[in-house]
């Protein structure tokens, strides 16, 4: 599984424009092969700062999404002024477990928490 962490600051007065574009792209993501989930978070300290956290089956799915024309157009609009700054991180998920799904829980944690 791949995690894409997109941190960005919206330029003054451009927040709503970004959110509208994100909503449109969300429609494209629905049913996109290899897409798992996405969440968007807004900073409590700086209302212009956001983090978008998406999960993908594999890097090939990320590559295909990166090259979807509507996504490329949205990227260009972001770089042209919607974002005052951004940072993108792409990471391999090492473990994925929850309170109830424990298969990938580290042994030492299982010993303590079950």
Descriptions of predicted regions:
Residues 74, 78:
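Conserved short loop/helix modules at catalytic or binding sites
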Residues 1-50, 57-67, 82-114:
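Short S/T/G/P-rich N-terminal loop/turn motif that feeds into the first structured element of a domain
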